[in-house]
Amino acid sequence: MKNAFSLLNPRIRELIRKEGYLHPTPPQEKAIPVILKGGNVLLIAPTGWGKTEAVFFPLFHLLLDDPRGEGIKAIYVTPLRALNRDLFRRMQSLASSLGIRMAMRHGDTSGYERRKQLLFPPDILITTPETLQAILPAPKMREHLRRVRFVVVDEIHEIASSKRGTQLSLALERLVNLTGREFQRVGLSATVGSHEVIANFLGGVGRNVTI
């Protein structure tokens, strides 16, 4: 019987099978097809139900199909540097096996790593709201950010309910202006008070979000 994993690139299916991902969880079964079709998604599910994989697996698929060259194609925003590091640790091996470059960028990032990102921009940049706001005006980073096609916001309830939410909303609109087109948006949360409010925060004005 086919499931959401059957929609993924065969290389991804083989890799995740070796990692022990044999069957999608219910959130993955629902989210993966929508993400693959280009829809904006707010994914709400308890911790331990594979929300991260529900985003990264289809993201890897879409990046493998991306014909464009160098540049940052996906931005993954989290509220915490520790979460950045955890995500990188969990997904870097899979990404590397697929030839997809990942990198982190936040206040602790070394000067060497920042220069490396300018010379060899990652396909996926994991960052924080503050750092995204900080790199948007930088001329060389702007060139790399013009290729962004996807933005993921993890722990979106924490960001939306604070001053950082306004900061991130402004950064995303600036990113739309920079890219000259809409990009796909995905929000992740284990708990959300009002689904509609968070979906509106994620999508902004006039953009549909599937919950």
Task: Tell me the role of every PLM-derived stretch.
Residues 6-7, 13-211:
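Conserved P-loop/Walker A NTP-binding site and adjacent catalytic elements of P-loop NTPases
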Residues 1-3:
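Interdomain "pre-motor" coupling segment immediately N-terminal to P-loop NTPase/helicase cores
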